[in-house]
Amino acid sequence: MARRNPLLFAIVVTILFVVCYGSALIAQTPPPVDNFVASAHYGSFKKRHGKAFGGDAEEGHRFNAFKQNMQTAYFLNTQNPHAHYDVSGKFADLTPQEFAKLYLNPDYYARHLKNHKEDVHVDDSAPSGVMSVDWRDKGAVTPVKNQGLCGSCWAFSAIGNIEGQWAASGHSLVSLSEQMLVSCDNIDEGCNGGLMDQAMNWIMQSHNGSVFTEASYPYTSGGGTRPPCHDEGEVGAKITGFLSLPHDEERIAEWVEKRGPVAVAVDATTWQLYFGGVVSLCLAWSLNHGVLIVGFNKNAKPPYWIVKNSWGSSWGEKGYIRLAMGSNQCMLKNYPVSATVESPHTPHVPTTTA
């Protein structure tokens, strides 16, 4: 997933908004942060998250990152009237570069996405006109999980999709094993990144479509290590293939409505300080993180996608983020994929396994 220099990122953002908004940007420029105010917020942040640092140099580095993030949150709030960014979240003492390195799988998408083979599936049936769907309410979404310090978002996205497709097709919801993919999938790179369709391809080619339960093969890579594959566990679900969906939000919404959750890749660079609400300006340039669409609401103002993340339930809206529909926020429509599952309750869907 793509790494970016934080200084370059700040310069590009500034140029972008000067070009787009001209003199209006002057009123939105973050004001200087008073050290006394920043210290008070920083003290509350450390207490809330149990943070303690060993020396003055590290303490100073964290405080400076926190102070800079206060300005970043202010700027993002001015651009997102329906969302809230804040420094009370657990990532507020990280620089943008540190955050990207730890949670956004640097460089992987840039190196591998060009090899992504599209096999676009188009559902020719007429749209139903359904305005809102939430698969959490339909019992097709497991609780929010936490990838930890491992760059395994791709595994959580792929497994979340399979969990959702399995339950949406009429089977009982079961939590499946991300660790099976992280440790055993030799197409992808464990904690160093992967792609959701590659993971599904490995499941089909090397695992006969079978996925182990989380209970029988629990996640152990939260510290950033990749234990050897032991390839033993209880089969909890079985897929018949996978496919790429059209890069079109209406088509993605149709799939979510009729079939269930969809795995997507996004640019999550600005998610570091997200606290809640609907993001309507994401500032996205390149894909770097895998997540799961579990629903949408077209009746809301603005209409939004419901997206499940894998940074634990203390991040965002209990582990979720809402992105405005219709404007490709965070590049959400650029890489939608889904596994397919046989079920007597749904018609057969053409699949691809390569």
From Swiss-Prot:
Coiled-coil ranges (or none): none
Gene Ontology terms: biological process: proteolysis
UniProt keyword list: Disulfide bond, Glycoprotein, Hydrolase, Protease, Signal, Thiol protease, Zymogen
Top-level enzyme category: hydrolase
Prosegment residue ranges: 25-125
Annotated signal sequence range: 1-24
EC number: 3.4.22.-
Molecular function GO labels: cysteine-type peptidase activity
Residues forming the catalytic site: 153, 289, 309
Cysteines engaged in disulfide bonds, as pairs: 150-191, 184-229, 282-330
Pfam families per UniProt: Inhibitor_I29, Peptidase_C1
Gene3D superfamilies, sorted: 1.10.287.2250, Cysteine proteinases
Matching InterPro entries: Papain-like_cys_pep_sf, Pept_asp_AS, Pept_cys_AS, Pept_his_AS, Peptidase_C1A, Peptidase_C1A_C, Peptidase_C1A_papain-like, Prot_inhib_I29
Glycosylation sites: 208
Top-level taxon of the source organism: Eukaryota
Membership in a protein family: Belongs to the peptidase C1 family.
Record's protein name: Cysteine proteinase A
Biological source species: Leishmania mexicana
